[in-house]
């Protein structure tokens, strides 16, 4: 993880740790001129590692985004941001996207009252995301919400921390996407 962060820069979804300031300078000095291929590859790898995707999953999302109306890049980022694991991360119910994936895989999360155990589940506007009524599930989410720094919540999400409930209001606006892609 730390090698990826050092190579690609800060990836907020992967871990809360940041690369040291000196390591970035060393990489720039050593790297020389960056080709177009290298720039594109690094941006693709940023997407993959930030959202925890395989190569095949990313290609599928690119294919869907290419067919949709509008800018392919913006549509791609909207698709990725509307994944259940990413929405849990944005709501503050998990400290990282891999942590959110684990919550979903272990069946702690309900969407519209139904257990969803697929992290790539695509959330839609007006979806209600809650935790199971079990004490263990509520304790996990409570710890994450209490320990996470209260960052500003994106406009497309609302959270009720006392009921452990999140609501997807609309599709994400491009200014709220936390990852800087070239």
Swiss-Prot record:
Give the GO terms filed under biological process for this record.
ribosomal small subunit biogenesis; translation
Its gene? rps4
Matching entries from InterPro entries are given as: Ribosomal_uS4 (IPR022801), Ribosomal_uS4_bac-type (IPR005709), Ribosomal_uS4_CS (IPR018079), Ribosomal_uS4_N (IPR001912), S4_RNA-bd (IPR002942), S4_RNA-bd_sf (IPR036986)
Q: Which organism is it from?
A: Isophysis tasmanica
Supply the name of the protein. Answer: Small ribosomal subunit protein uS4c
Note the subunit structure. Part of the 30S ribosomal subunit. Contacts protein S5. The interaction surface between S4 and S5 is involved in control of translational fidelity.
Question: What is the role of the protein in this entry?
Answer: One of the primary rRNA binding proteins, it binds directly to 16S rRNA where it nucleates assembly of the body of the 30S subunit.
Which GO molecular function annotations are given, in alphabetical order? rRNA binding; structural constituent of ribosome
Q: What is its main location?
A: plastid
Organism classification: Eukaryota, Viridiplantae, Streptophyta, Embryophyta, Tracheophyta
């Amino acid at each position: 993880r730390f090698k990826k962060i050092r190579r690609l820069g800060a990836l907020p979804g992967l871990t809360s740790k940041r690369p040291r300031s000196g390591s970035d300078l060393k990489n720039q000095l050593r790297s020389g001129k960056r080709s177009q291929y290298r720039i594109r590859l690094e941006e693709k790898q940023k997407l993959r590692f930030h959202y925890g995707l395989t190569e095949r999953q990313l290609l599928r999302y690119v294919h869907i985004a290419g067919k949709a109306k509008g800018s392919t890049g913006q549509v791609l980022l909207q698709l990725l941001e509307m994944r259940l694991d990413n929405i849990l991360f944005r709501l503050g119910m998990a400290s990282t996207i891999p942590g959110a994936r684990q919550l979903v895989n272990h069946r702690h999360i309900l969407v519209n009252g139904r257990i969803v155990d697929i992290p790539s589940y695509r959330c839609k506007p007006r979806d209600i995301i809650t935790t199971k009524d079990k004490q263990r599930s509520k304790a996990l989410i409570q710890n994450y919400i209490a320990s996470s720094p209260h960052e500003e919540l994106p406009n497309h999400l609302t959270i009720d921390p006392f009921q452990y409930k999140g609501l997807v209001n609309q599709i994400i606006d491009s200014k709220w996407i936390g990852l800087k892609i070239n």
